[in-house]
């Protein structure tokens, strides 16, 4: 308005800003910060914003400055020319860079041009575009910066598809937290309860069902969980990701039903040291896996626990070593009435409509689904 009598009749404006500290010569500090653009696409229109949090991965500040410049050009170009397709804005951010130079772990679109943009889906698209390996949502369902959330916090993780959240999921986390909070280095009030979903469980064919993804986020948030979507298939890579931000204890609660997966040597093909390398990277420091029991379906079936779970004969001594050294810890359920539950039966029942499945999920979850 102040320039109305001086400027041409039909200008549009934009402002670009980046606040990222350069890497110090003396210290290998984490280089991360905020980058954003505020733009008009039509003269006199209300502005819209695209803001993102970035991590610079180059080893010196000259390379980082170059990468930040390329990122800025990509953002400005995408915001002006691809604003009708925000997925294209995301996909174009790494043009000329690649994922080895920069990571974008949060992006937020706002303003009149982006009224219909679902920011949670755009952040999921960051993973699909190889701009990050994980995105995090707080219990309010809002996308948050992982480094700020996990910084110096103990973290308890449960991995699953959560389609839907079941009573077993809830009891696993509650029982695991009860034991995890007893560790000397854990302040119960600081624990981050993290439900992790891998991208593999969200993708059907080549596509992600956006409505299904949002429903899972909302159901987990209703139970008070922080949610992380990642493409970390192997547990030790998940642990390494969390170790970027915290040196406090990390706990992973796992059903004994998943031991076939954990102790499957094919799962570790491609690692030079195989399963030994994987477990060495999973348990190097202050990390524990809490093993939750299960009861096979059918009346009178024996409870399967960490003490009697079967693994391949050649791996029994490895299992014994991990148990003896308190790397694998047995969890005592708080509610053993659902130990026989099979999530496949819950899903099948849910598809048929109301029924017995409602007893196998928390009441607030059942009410949301109904």
Language model features by range: what are they?
Residues 1-370:
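Nucleotidyltransferase catalytic core that binds NTPs
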């Amino acid at each position: 308005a102040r320039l109305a009598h001086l400027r041409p009749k039909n200008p549009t404006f934009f402002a670009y800003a980046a606040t990222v500290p350069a890497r110090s010569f003396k210290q290998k500090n984490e280089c991360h910060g905020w980058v954003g653009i505020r733009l008009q696409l039509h003269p006199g229109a209300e502005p819209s914003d695209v803001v993102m949090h970035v991590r610079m991965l180059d080893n010196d500040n000259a390379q980082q400055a170059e990468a930040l410049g390329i990122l800025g050009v990509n953002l400005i170009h995408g915001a002006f020319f691809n604003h009708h397709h925000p997925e294209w804005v995301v996909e174009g951010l790494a043009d000329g860079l690649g994922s080895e130079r920069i990571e974008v772990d949060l992006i937020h679109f706002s303003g009149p041009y982006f009224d219909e943009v679902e920011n949670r889906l755009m952040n999921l698209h960051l993973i699909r575009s190889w701009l990050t390996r994980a995105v995090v949502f707080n219990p309010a369902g809002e996308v948050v910066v992982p480094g700020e959330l996990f910084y110096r916090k103990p973290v308890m993780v449960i991995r699953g598809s959560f389609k839907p959240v079941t009573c077993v999921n809830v009891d696993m986390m509650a029982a695991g937290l009860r034991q995890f909070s007893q560790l000397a280095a854990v302040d119960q009030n600081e624990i981050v309860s993290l439900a992790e979903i891998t991208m593999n469980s969200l993708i059907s064919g080549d596509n992600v069902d956006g409505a299904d993804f949002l429903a899972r986020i909302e159901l987990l948030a209703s139970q008070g969980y922080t949610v992380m979507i990642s493409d970390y298939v192997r547990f030790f890579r998940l642990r390494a990701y969390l170790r970027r931000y915290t040196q406090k204890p990390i706990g992973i609660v796992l059903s004994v039903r998943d031991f076939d997966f954990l102790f499957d040597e094919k799962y570790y093909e491609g690692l030079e040291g195989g399963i030994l390398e994987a477990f060495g990277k999973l348990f190097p420091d202050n990390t524990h896996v809490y093993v939750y029991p299960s009861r096979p379906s059918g009346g009178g079936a024996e409870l399967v626990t960490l003490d009697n779970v079967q693994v391949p004969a050649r791996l029994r001594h490895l299992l014994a070593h991990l148990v003896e050294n308190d790397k694998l810890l047995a969890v005592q359920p708080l509610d053993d009435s659902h130990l026989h539950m099979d999530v496949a039966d819950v899903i099948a029942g849910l598809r048929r409509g109301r029924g017995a499945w409602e007893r196998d999920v928390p009441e607030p979850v059942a009410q949301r689904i109904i």
